[in-house]
Amino acid sequence: ASHELKTPLTVILADSDVLLNHSTESISSQKKWIDSIQSEANRMRKLVENMLFLAKNDANRIEISMQNCSLSDICFHCVLPFESIAFEKGIDLIDEVEENIEVHGNESQLKQLILIFLDNAIKYTPSGGKIYFKLAKIQNKPVLTIRNTDSYIPPEDLKHVFERFYRVDKSRKYQGGAGLGLSIASQIAQSHKIKLSVTSDEKQGTEFTLNF
C-alpha cells in the first residue's frame, strides 16, 4: 500500500518542482504540469477511499441498508457513461439488459460493483476489441456477465485476480489502477451473497459472471 501511495506522491512533487522553477511563466504555459498534479491527486484520493473501504469492511464497520431495487435500471445507468469511453478507445460495447429484474441489496454498492467490472473491461480491452455486457434471468435467477475480448488471463494468475494489489499484467501500472478494484468487488459480492466467477480463454477473452 505504501508503494501505491508513493508513486503518485513522487509525480506530484516532481511536477510541483517544475512549476516552482518556472514560477514567472503563465499558468496556461504550465497547464501540462497542473493537469498531471490534478490527475495524480485524484488517483491518490481514489486509492485512499478504496483502502478505507477495505479497512472498514475488515473491521465489520460498514453499515449496509438493503432494500428491493431494480438491477436492470442500475445496469442501464452504469453502462451509459462507458459508451462514450468505449467509442473513444475504438471498443465495441455491446449491452443486452433484460428489463424488470429486481434484487434485494444496497443500490449504491451494487452500482459500485458493476462499475468496477466495466472499468476493468474498458481498461484491458485494446482498440478494436469488444465488450459484451449481459443481464438476464437464468432459471429465475439474475445473472450478469461481462466479457471482454483480446484479454487473456493465464491460469496461474486467474486464481489471484480478487486479491488486493494484484495485477495480472505488471506492465500496466501506468494505467492508474492500484489492484484494489476487484478485491472491493469481491467484498461487495460477499456482503450481497452474490457468487463471483471468472473464466479466461485465449480466443474468447475473459468473462466475469455474477450470480445473484
Regions found by a protein language model. Name each.
Residues 39-44:
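Short alpha-helical segment of the dimerization/phosphotransfer core of two-component systems
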Residues 121-122:
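Short helix-loop "hinge" at the ATP-lid/N-box region of the Bergerat-fold HATPase_c
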Residues 193-194:
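Conserved glycine-rich
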Residues 65-68, 87, 92-102:
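Conserved catalytic submotifs in the C-terminal HATPase_c
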Residues 20-27:
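Short acidic helix/loop segment immediately C-terminal to the autophosphorylated histidine
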